[in-house]
Amino acid sequence: MHLHEYQAKDLLTSYAIPMPPYRVASSVEEGRHTLNELGINAGVVKVQVHAGGRGKNGGVIVAKSPEEILAAVDQLLHMRFVSNQTSGEALPVEKVLITPLVNIAAEYYLAVIMDRKNRCPTIMLSKAGGVDIEEVAQKYPDQQLTISLTPFARLYNYQLRQMIKFMGWEGDTGKQGVQMIKNLVQCFYDNDASLLEINPLVRTQEGDLLVLDAKVTIDDNALYRHPKLEVLYDPSQENVRDVLAKQIGLSYIALDGNIGCLVNGAGLAMSTLDILKIHGGSAANFLDVGGSATEQQIQEAVSLVLSDENVEVLFINIFGGIMDCSAVASGLVAVMQTRENLIPTVVRLEGTNVELGKEIVQCSGIPCKFTDSLNTGAQLAVALSK
C-alpha cells in the first residue's frame, strides 16, 4: 500500500526524522489557514498523488508570495495528474502539501528497500539527489552505495561509518546522518515497509540534514498488524477494478493489454502472462482467484475482467486441484448468459470435475473454444485478439 507524501512524512516524523514544517490543504480556504499556521510568505505547493514525476509534470509549484501560494493551491486542486508512472490514467488531486522554501547546500538520496535479488532489506545512498535514482545508477554508479541488512543485527556500526564517510558528512552533519539512518531502518522494520525513500534528502547552508520529499510503501500482507496505517488507504488513487477486487477478496492487477485472464494460483497466472507475451499477445490483467473460489466468486471475477473495455478476448486457465472445474464453468455461464455482446472466450480446464465443467459450458450454448494445452490456449487467445 502506497502512502501520500504527507502521510509518509507523518510516519517519519514519529521516528524523529527531521524535515521542514508542512501542512495539507484540500481547499483554498484551508490553504489560507495553512499560511497563517506556517507563518510563511513563500513556499512550495505539491499535489498529493500516488505517483512520481510530479515536478516534471506540473505537480509542484514554487511560489514566492502568499498570493502565489494560494493561486498554486487553487490551480493544483483542479487538475488531474498524469505522469509516466500513472499508466496513462489521470489521478485526482484532493489534497496539496504546502511547505516553506529551504536554503539547500547539497541534495542526496537515501532509502531502505527490499532487495529481491539478495533477499534482504538494503540501504541505498547516493550523493546525487533530487533526480531519478535509476538514472544515477546508470550514469554515475560511483555515486551510489548499497548496504545489505541482516535480519538479526540489522545495522552494524562499521556500516554506519562506511555510509557517513561515503556521503562526505562530517561533524554534526555526520552525527545527524547516523541517527537518521538508524531511525529510518527502525521505521522500516517496525511498519513492515517494502520501501522508505527520501529524495531529496538535503543539507542546508547551516549543515542540517532535512527530508524534503518522502515515499513509503507498506507490505499489503502485513496491514492487519498495522490498523493505524491500514486506514490511510486511498482508493481514489487506484484503478477502479483494483479497488473492487480488494473488496471481494481477489488478487487483481490491471495491465495494458487486451486479453482478459482468469487463472487460479499466482504461479500459473504469471506463467499465463508470460506465454501470452511469448506468442505476441498482451494480458489486460493479472487475476488469481485462488484455490477454493466459489461459484459466486467466479461470477464476480468474470464480471470484473469483462468490465475492462480494453478486453477483447477472455482466457480462462484453471488447474483444478482443490478448485472445482464445475464451479468455474457454472460461474462463467451465469455471467455470459446475462451479456448481449459476447467476446471470444478460450477455456482450459484440467483437474477436479473437468468433464462436468466442460459439459456445463457446452450445454449452455455459449461460444467457447476449449483446449487441453496452455501453449495452444495462449496461441488461440492471441490469434483471436489480433
Swiss-Prot record:
Its cofactor is Mg(2+). GO terms for molecular function: ATP binding; magnesium ion binding; succinate-CoA ligase (ADP-forming) activity; succinate-CoA ligase (GDP-forming) activity. It catalyses: succinate + ATP + CoA = succinyl-CoA + ADP + phosphate; GTP + succinate + CoA = succinyl-CoA + GDP + phosphate. One of its GO terms (cellular component) is cytosol. The keyword Nucleotide-binding applies. InterPro entries: ATP-grasp, ATP-grasp_succ-CoA_synth-type, ATP_grasp_subdomain_1, Succ-CoA_synthase_bsu_CS, SUCC_ACL_C, Succ_CoA_ligase-like_bsu, Succinyl-CoA_synth-like. Pathway: Carbohydrate metabolism; tricarboxylic acid cycle; succinate from succinyl-CoA (ligase route): step 1/1. This is Succinate--CoA ligase [ADP-forming] subunit beta.
